[in-house]
């Protein structure tokens, strides 16, 4: 595979060197397109840039998500963007009825609309104290998740008992649930604007809790950051100037979503195919 980029005296990319078992060589090229993976399989890069992914989650990727493409681009003067961001998720739904409950942190506070896309919810979980969170539902809305990714902790006859068992400050969960129930009964959520179809008072005991905490739920994820590029896939330097002859597309280029909270499944497919085509066309024109 590729080992390093070759630059000419002006700093433009002029080719690439390669190694295949014991053989080595170089290829002269007017344009080089890096179309490689992210860096989720590179433990050193993950620890340096996205430590949450290094703690517990199951990584989503393949052996070629080793960050080589990004490192090649950086070696030629390329800048990176969003390297500290990651897609990480452990969906508690389906069934959708679970989204009528509330998700709270270890302080008993809500922090996200429960009907958010699952990676957005998970991204906010990562921001909470100790990356700990719980999904709370009452008996009327309790069902088992269809995917066994979040652990059922237990059920309690009163909210006060649940609050104590989960180690939350006295009165915190009671106040949060009372506030939520008051507005949910009216079909409103002034705090996080959850859609009315997912609003329902959780006021019929007993109450159950599912553990969404990092290290308890089965999270999976991948990296979002990569080389900075323009609309033609040209790799940019730290001053946002294109590096002549160098292009990048796919997971080695920074994602359109910019962070895991803004990512939606399939985004990489769209950006990879669209900007890959633009990069290829521009590189071909540059090579004439």
Residue ranges and their predicted role:
Residues 1-178, 182-288:
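Residues forming the flavin
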């Amino acid at each position: 595979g590729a080992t390093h980029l070759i630059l000419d005296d002006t700093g433009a990319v002029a080719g690439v060197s390669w190694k295949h078992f014991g053989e080595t060589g170089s290829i002269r090229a007017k344009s080089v397109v890096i179309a490689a993976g992210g860096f989720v399989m590179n433990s050193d890069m993950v620890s340096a840039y996205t430590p949450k992914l290094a703690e517990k989650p199951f990584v989503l990727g393949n052996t070629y998500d080793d960050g080589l493409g990004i490192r090649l681009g950086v070696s030629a003067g390329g800048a990176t963007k969003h390297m500290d961001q990651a897609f990480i998720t452990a969906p508690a739904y389906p069934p959708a009825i679970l989204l009528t409950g509330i998700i709270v942190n270890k302080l008993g506070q809500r922090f996200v609309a429960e009907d958010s896309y699952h990676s957005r919810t998970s991204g906010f979980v990562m921001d909470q104290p100790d990356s700990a969170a719980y999904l709370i539902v009452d008996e009327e809305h309790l069902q088992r998740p269809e995917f066994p990714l979040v652990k059922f902790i237990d059920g309690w006859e009163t909210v006060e008992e649940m609050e104590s068992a989960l180690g939350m400050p006295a009165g915190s969960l009671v106040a949060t649930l009372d506030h939520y129930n008051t507005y949910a009964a009216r079909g409103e959520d002034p705090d996080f604007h959850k859609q009315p179809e997912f609003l329902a008072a959780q006021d019929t005991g007993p109450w159950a809790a599912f553990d969404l905490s990092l290290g308890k739920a089965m999270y999976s994820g991948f990296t979002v950051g990569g080389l900075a590029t323009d609309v033609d896939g040209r790799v940019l330097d730290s001053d946002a100037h294109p590096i002549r002859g160098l292009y990048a597309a796919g997971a080695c280029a920074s994602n359109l979503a910019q962070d895991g909270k803004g990512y939606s499944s399939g985004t990489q497919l769209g950006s990879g195919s669209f900007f890959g085509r633009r990069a290829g066309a521009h590189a071909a024109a540059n090579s004439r």
